[in-house]
A protein has these predicted regions:
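Conserved RNase H-like, two-metal-ion catalytic cores of nucleic-acid enzymes
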Residues: 3-4, 8, 14-53, 69-70, ...
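Function-dense linear segments that define catalytic or interfacial modules
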Residues: 344-348, 408-431, 440-442, 447, ...
Length: 868
């Protein structure tokens, strides 16, 4: 049989530290459990085991502590956030049919060693999964060690057997114990021989084999005198370390591989635990029946009648039924970004209106303009897109389940109906079509009303009704119309610019090759590192396991060391500009000559809107060449672009919500806030503030908004950490209201578990309760800056809704086409451009009443470049 043995403590630690803190609604941490079980699933896919054993350490001294009192001394205790998850993880593993093993007085490593030895004896295959290299000593006689590690920020698993260890270390797996005996192990506080490092220890074992061989002929072996003296001095410690580092194979456990065969476990208990932990996706990953309850029965609340699916052949008949219902629930079915069907649950019947029927356009126009019904949908932006294409405007959409779920759980990765059904404990009825095939979409459509009932109550409890109905719901329509409108582009101009970049890239390539002395792949960090640090001999300050680091920070530090570095930096900038922006944009120009981006309303935790396919919010502006790209975004013939941008909106929000009178007065007097801050922080009159001092004050201002500390600020503005700290301290002394606000926000978030904007948007912060200082500090930074960033995001959303309504109310042809952070762009007929600019700036400046007046700067141009 194939036996998979997991080093439970090692794997759970990797899971805990590798995944951001996750909590249930009640605040129970779940990230270690979630990560561990996902790792287990991947291991099963790799090894296809018949049996699984999960070995855990027992929280008590072992025989090694009796041998050496300082064994593992100094190890930090397990974080409480992880400790609390351990018993539940073990309970879940048993419920899922796995066997956990704990052996008092012994370590989990010894359980691994004992099971590995048993498999060797029985001829069974054994896979040991761990993150600890100590286990490599077991990789012989048919035992393979799956070593989990991190490479380039990604989790990878290396498979070790005797051949792999010989290739990497030049010795046998068993000889690795001898290496450890010499070099010691600081993580376990195993002493080794003081002054003998990993390189020397490995060399000694490669040449002489064992401690016994080394010490037998210590005086005559070819060993450096200094090393020989160290070996002689610490002989006892070397042998002690050998004993401590040797994994035993005789732990008193049931070592028969068959004992660890995976059983059926207790599926109902597992489902109940997954529900309690709100880890709904794992129910499906482990192929469990989501409706099971303890006792083995299937949950009863499923409808007595199974859903019926009826494809609509008469649009008027369905319209009559929907008018009679009054409250209409609808789920758009999507394929490749296009609506293929509309599903309408009425009781246990789901009426389907296919998009390819001749009556579809008439049906959509009639339903979405019908004032006698209220529409409650899922992803209603798609309904608005349908309406726009039919030349009507929806005025009867009263709810969107996806938006409600997002407001309630802004940190979730997805909000699909199946996930929401699990999260809110709504049973999904089974449905099979006439071909006896499952059709989940029909079953999910039936439960839409019940899901709405549950989320609506929670929205009201959270005080987010106004946020939903006055901002998010109408915004979905605005975004849909912007997507349909798109942005006109100069295709020929982009193509010409791409060719220009290609020419310059080719020239740079030749110059780089000439400087280095040979051709190589400039895009390969490994080859570039060799070229810079070996061929050219430039000073290397940062080297990783995979080679030399050649990131932007490293190259910036080498800029003055050799002229080729400047060329490499330019090469990188231009290749990114060409591939991502020029060539990337050319691929997505639609048949109408415009680019139609998609806006995601439910992605960011702060409430900001994101853009994708393509991401027009990432068009570069920091470099002259990057800004050139904006010249290719143009107004349609006979039109102009109206561009308005909030002036320092986040700082204005900060001044208002902190009630700092000094900052409020500076803004409302019309003073330049960065100059005013510089004058206060540096103790100089405004007229003596140089551009450099203003730039530093600007960095401090925005650093406060984004929660950066002295280290990051020092790096940004090129000063010492001490100077940066002095700037921040002086800032807080100047703006004492801001300092008090920061502390209030942290205290409030600790009390409630979340940070909130002026409009009630929440971001939950389990990190604030973390025992780990770094995690807790992160939570405090978010508690300080989320209300600022989130409120700014809410304000521009309000402005978008109002601009859209105003343009429509005044029967103008002008239309919003893009939002980028704090900037709105309207495409307007030439005759309407001035009026459109007036409307946009008015609505942006009056979107929210605060102590500091909002200001929007607007401009009109033929291209995005001209208008900005």
């Amino acid at each position: 049989m194939n036996l998979l043995v997991l080093d439970g403590n090692s794997i759970v630690n990797r899971a805990f530290y590798g995944i951001k803190l996750l909590t249930t609604k009640s605040g129970y941490y779940t990230n270690a459990i979630y990560g561990f079980l996902n790792i287990l699933l991947k291991l099963q896919d790799t090894c296809h085991p018949d049996g699984v054993a999960v070995a855990f350490d027992v929280h008590e001294p072992t025989f090694r502590h009796k041998q050496y009192a300082d064994y593992k001394a100094g190890r930090k205790p397990m974080p409480q956030e992880l400790r609390a998850q351990m018993p539940v993880l073990k309970e879940l593993l048993i419920a899922l049919g796995y066997t956990t093993v704990e052996c008092p007085g012994w370590e989990a490593d010894d359980v691994l060693g004992t099971l590995a030895a048993a498999c060797r004896d029985s001829g069974d295959t054994c896979f040991i999964a761990t993150g600890d290299r100590d286990a490599l000593q077991l990789a012989h006689g048919g035992v393979k060690v799956l070593l989990a590690r991190t490479k380039m920020g990604q989790a990878v698993t290396d498979v070790y057997d005797e051949a792999a260890i010989a290739a990497e270390y030049g010795i046998t797996p068993q000889a690795l114990i001898q290496v450890k005996a010499l070099q010691g192990d600081s993580s376990d506080n195993i002493p080794g021989v003081a002054g003998v490092g990993a390189k020397t220890a490995l060399d000694l074992v490669q040449r002489f084999g064992t401690l016994d061989a080394i010490y037998k002929d210590l005086d005559t072996l070819d060993i450096k005198p200094g090393v020989r003296e160290k070996l002689r001095r610490d002989k006892d410690k070397a042998y002690l370390s050998l004993d401590l580092g040797t994994i035993r194979s005789n732990a008193p456990i049931d070592a028969a591989p068959a004992h660890y065969a995976v059983t059926g476990g207790d599926p109902a208990a597992a489902v109940a635990l997954f529900r309690k932990l709100e880890l709904f996706s794992l129910i499906d990953k482990f192929n469990l029946d989501r409706d099971l309850v303890p006792g083995g029965e299937t949950e009863a609340p499923a409808p007595a009648h199974q859903p019926e699916r009826l494809t609509c052949v008469d649009a008027d008949d369905l319209l009559t039924r929907l008018r009679k219902a009054g409250d209409v629930y609808v789920v758009p079915q999507m394929a490749e970004g296009t609506v293929t069907d509309l599903f309408f649950p009425l009781g246990d019947t789901v009426f389907v209106m296919p998009a390819d029927t001749p009556e579809f356009g008439y049906f959509v126009r009639t339903l979405l303009a019908e004032d006698t019904v209220r529409i409650f949908g899922y992803n209603t932006k798609e309904l608005h897109r349908l309406a726009q294409k039919q030349g009507v405007r929806c005025g009867n959409i009263c709810g969107d389940l996806q938006l409600s779920a997002y407001l309630l759980r802004p940190s979730d990765a997805k909000y699909d109906l199946a996930q929401l059904a699990l999260e809110y404990n709504v049973p999904v009825p089974a449905y099979r079509n006439s071909l006896d095939q499952e059709e989940p979409a029909v079953a999910l459509a039936v439960i839409l009303p019940e899901l709405f009932a549950k989320t609506d109550a929670l929205i009201d409890d959270a005080g987010q009704r106004k946020l939903l109905t006055e901002i998010e719901l109408p915004l979905a329509g605005v975004l849909a119309r912007m997507e349909c409108a798109g942005f006109d582009v100069d295709k020929a101009g982009i193509e010409a610019f791409s060719k220009k970049l290609s020419t310059r890239i080719s020239t740079l390539t030749d110059e780089i090759f000439e400087a280095v002395g040979h051709e190589f792949n400039i895009n390969s960090p490994k080859q570039l590192g060799v070229a810079l640090f070996e061929d050219l001999g430039l000073p290397c300050k940062k080297k990783t396991k995979s080679g030399y680091s050649t990131n932007a920070e490293v190259l910036e530090g080498l800029r003055s060391a050799h002229p080729v570095v400047e060329k490499i930096m330019e090469y990188r900038t231009l290749t990114k500009l060409k591939s991502t922006y020029c060539d990337g944009l050319l691929k997505v120009i639609d048949t109408d000559g415009r680019i139609h981006t998609r806006f995601n309303q439910v992605e960011t935790r702060t409430g900001r809107i994101s853009s994708l396919e393509p991401n027009l919010q990432n068009i570069p502006i920091r470099t002259d060449l990057g800004r050139e790209m904006r010249k290719f975004f143009i107004a349609a013939p006979g039109c102009r672009l109206v561009d308005a941008d909030y002036s320092q909106i986040e700082l204005r929000v900060l001044a208002s919500i902190s009630e700092d009178q000094t900052m409020i007065d500076a803004f409302n007097s019309g003073a330049d806030i960065h100059t005013a801050t510089a004058a206060q922080v540096f103790g100089l009159p405004p007229e003596m503030i140089t551009p450099q001092l203003r730039s530093r004050a600007k960095a401090v201002n925005f650093g406060i908004v984004y929660g950066i500390g002295a280290f990051s600020l020092a790096k940004d503005i090129g000063v010492s950490n001490k100077e940066a700290k002095e700037y921040i301290d002086s800032y807080m002394h100047t703006y004492q209201g801001v300092a008090a606000y920061m502390q209030r926000m942290i205290d409030a978030a600790k009390d409630t578990g979340y940070a909130t904007t002026l409009f009630g948007r929440r971001r939950y912060l389990p990190e604030l309760a973390a025992s780990n200082h770094m995690l807790r500090a992160f939570g405090e930074r978010v508690a300080r800056n989320m209300p600022i960033q989130g409120t700014a995001a809410d304000i521009i959303k309000i402005a978008m809704v109002r601009v859209d309504r105003r343009l429509y109310a005044e029967r103008m042809e002008s239309r919003l086409i893009l939002q980028v952070h704090d900037e709105l762009i309207v495409e307007a007929p030439e005759a309407e451009a001035d009026r459109a600019l007036q409307i946009v700036t008015e609505e942006m400046e009056h979107a929210c009443d605060m102590a500091v007046l909002l200001r929007a700067d607007g401009k009109i141009g033929q291209t995005w470049y001209d208008a900005h």
